[in-house]
């Protein structure tokens, strides 16, 4: 091996490179061939090493004897200090980014940490890391807005608003505060003083400057991620869509970010293309700076957007109830012309506070409040108050279930004497069918091929492989594609044989699943009723028998019942059938939506009671005034 001392040390005496992970503390021995583009990856947590501890020695750093004893014998003279790397190009914060074709990659692999003086003093390191981090987040936000406009049909107004919100958010976070660097250095000094007591003299001599440099870098990065989290770009996108009155929900943003349709998980690869290589002006790579550990949930995303609006002093409107409710009704295949006007009246009448964004992560999301208003409107319009409508549907199926050619419950003939009951029956049947059609799963989870492609393009993007590994991956891909074609042919044949043997006997039960032959051997209505009871128990509900008579015309408020030492919700079957497709579409638990419905109904009842009292008071005042104006008879 020809080496003049400028590269990595070779393996002499069976030794290697001992690296200790900065994240999990796991140490392991590495060889030169284990490096990936000059970087070593932790075998415990897959983090990339930026600081190293070299336990091997380079024999070319010492004078060679004829017997080459210096490579095997402990040197008596002190180890010479290696020369620091030259200052990187484009170190100034105001330097222009290089062209895309000439990224200015370093000529030597960074398999060891840079020298103590390579990046200057800690103040310069903090300025470089901060400038690179803020510019990189702005690039990611720009890519996300482009994807929203081009792929998801978001108006250009949202993109223009996002720029203003982002600048105000950066200013409010005080990330460019002059005292920030001094605070971080003071924290780093206190941490080093705590560790200095446990260090011996030998450990202080081995790479102490490099460890101090690395600790400064990651201390700055942790502070920046607390002030400007990576997920704040998603929150700014949603906040801009909310202000622009778009129908984009937090669930949409999170799903697109998870599936790679919105640049987030793999967006760090685009930062280097626009800003150049991070090794030129920052000691940390783009993967370390902008790679998120996880995708934030929809609940936390809405709270983050509300927190940003609160910190920048932005007065927010309520959600665009009309368009969002119209979208939900369309996805559930419900009559928009009949339901939406009544829902809008309830919205204008109640105006619940949950329709505004909040920074409280424990509050119910705004989309749940929209769903609650729609459910209350449906209960008022169709009279779904536990009268046993679903049980009557099950009895109808039981009566016609013995005839294989009987029509499905969706096409039950209406009763001329009771059209309202028919409307409610059709509503529940439509909701039961829509519950099966709602698909809240990710696209990459539908088949193995899409999942493997997702892992290649999103999860493991930015990782390089050797030629042998790439060739091996291509072989495995070809083998998988061949087996996939064979499996598709076999599945098609099995489906055709199954259709011929069953001859169309399988029917869809009211709970949304297909009943097999064993289920259909029992009465069809009992099968559907027992299935819905089991589903209610799984979701924390207790089935209640239908009401025999209506006690009052007010709202039906359900209470909780104690069962096995815990409180569970009680509900009728028809109300649960109405509740669960809305909860699935909003991607929340059924109990959360049920609690929101009860809260809204209590608020409406309180408003109606106050209005009734006010009207009675006005009527009494009017009568008293009329009596006073009446002339006194002689």
Swiss-Prot record:
Keywords: DNA-binding, Metal-binding, Nucleus, Transcription, Transcription regulation, Zinc, Zinc-finger
Chain residue ranges for the region called B-linker: 81-83
Single GO molecular function: zinc ion binding
Coiled coil: none
The keyword Zinc-finger is assigned to this record: yes
Gene Ontology CC annotation, any one: RNA polymerase I core factor complex
Organism lineage string: Eukaryota, Viridiplantae, Streptophyta, Embryophyta, Tracheophyta
Species per Swiss-Prot/TrEMBL record: Oryza sativa subsp. indica (Rice)
A GO biological-process term: nucleolar large rRNA transcription by RNA polymerase I
Compositionally biased intervals (Pro residues): 77-87
Region (C-terminal cyclin fold): 282-284
PANTHER family membership: TATA BOX-BINDING PROTEIN-ASSOCIATED FACTOR RNA POLYMERASE I SUBUNIT B
Protein name, entry field: TATA box-binding protein-associated factor RNA polymerase I subunit B
């Amino acid at each position: 091996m020809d080496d003049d001392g400028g590269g990595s040390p070779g393996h002499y005496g069976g030794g290697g490179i001992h690296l200790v992970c900065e994240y999990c503390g796991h140490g392991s021995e590495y060889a030169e061939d284990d490096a990936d583009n000059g970087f070593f990856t932790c075998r415990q947590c897959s983090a990339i090493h930026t600081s190293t501890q070299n336990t091997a020695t380079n024999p070319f750093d010492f004078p060679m004897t004829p017997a080459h004893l210096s490579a095997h014998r402990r040197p008596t003279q002190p180890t010479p200090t290696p020369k620091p790397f030259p200052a990187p190009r484009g170190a100034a914060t105001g330097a222009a980014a290089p062209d895309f074709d000439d990224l200015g990659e370093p000529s030597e692999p960074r398999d060891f940490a840079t020298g103590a003086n390579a990046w200057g003093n800690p103040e310069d390191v903090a300025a470089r890391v901060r400038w690179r981090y803020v510019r990189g987040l702005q690039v990611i936000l720009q890519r996300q807005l482009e994807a929203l406009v081009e792929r998801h049909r978001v108006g250009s107004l949202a993109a223009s608003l996002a720029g203003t919100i982002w600048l105000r958010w950066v200013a409010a976070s005080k990330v460019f505060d002059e005292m920030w660097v001094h605070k971080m250095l003071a924290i780093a000094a206190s941490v080093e003083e705590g560790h200095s007591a446990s260090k011996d003299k030998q450990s202080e001599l081995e790479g102490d400057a490099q460890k101090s440099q690395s600790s400064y870098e990651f201390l700055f990065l942790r502070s920046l991620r607390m002030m400007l989290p990576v997920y704040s770009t998603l929150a700014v996108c949603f906040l801009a869509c909310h202000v622009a009155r778009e129908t984009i929900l937090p669930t949409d943003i999170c799903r697109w970010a998870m599936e790679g349709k919105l640049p987030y998980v793999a967006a760090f690869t685009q930062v280097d293309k626009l800003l150049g290589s991070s090794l030129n002006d920052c000691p940390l790579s783009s993967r370390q700076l902008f790679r998120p550990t996880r995708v934030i949930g929809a609940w936390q995303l809405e709270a983050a957007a509300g927190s940003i609006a609160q910190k920048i002093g932005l007065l927010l409107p309520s959600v665009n109830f009309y368009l969002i409710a119209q979208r939900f009704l369309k996805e559930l295949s419900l009559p928009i012309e009949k339901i939406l006007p009544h829902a809008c009246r309830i919205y204008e009448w109640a105006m619940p506070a949950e329709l505004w964004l909040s920074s409280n992560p424990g509050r119910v999301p705004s989309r749940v409040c929209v769903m609650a208003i729609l459910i209350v409107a449906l209960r008022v319009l169709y009279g779904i108050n536990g009268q046993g409508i679903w049980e009557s549907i099950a009895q109808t199926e039981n009566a016609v279930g013995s005839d294989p050619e009987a029509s499905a419950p969706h096409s039950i003939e209406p009763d001329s004497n009771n059209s309202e009951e028919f409307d409610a029956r059709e509503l529940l049947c439509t909701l039961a069918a829509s519950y099966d059609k709602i698909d809240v799963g990710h696209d990459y989870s539908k088949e193995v091929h899409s999942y493997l492609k997702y892992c290649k393009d999103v999860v493991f993007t930015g990782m390089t492989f050797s030629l042998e590994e790439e060739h091996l991956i291509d072989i495995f891909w070809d083998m998988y594609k061949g087996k996939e074609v064979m499996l598709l042919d076999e599945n098609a044949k099995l489906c055709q044989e199954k259709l011929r043997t069953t001859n169309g006997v399988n029917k869809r039960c009211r709970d949304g699943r297909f009943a097999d032959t064993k289920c259909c051997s029992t009465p069809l209505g009992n099968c559907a009723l027992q299935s819905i009871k089991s589903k209610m128990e799984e979701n924390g509900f207790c089935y209640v028998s239908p009401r025999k008579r209506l006690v009052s015309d007010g709202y039906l408020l359900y209470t909780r019942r104690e069962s096995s030492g815990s409180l569970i919700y009680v509900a009728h079957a028809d109300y649960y059938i109405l509740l669960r497709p809305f909860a699935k579409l909003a991607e929340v638990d059924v109990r959360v939506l049920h609690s929101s419905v009860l809260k809204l109904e209590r608020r409406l009842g309180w408003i109606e009671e106050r209005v009734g009292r006010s009207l009675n008071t006005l009527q009494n005042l009017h009568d008293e005034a009329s009596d006073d104006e009446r002339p006194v008879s002689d």
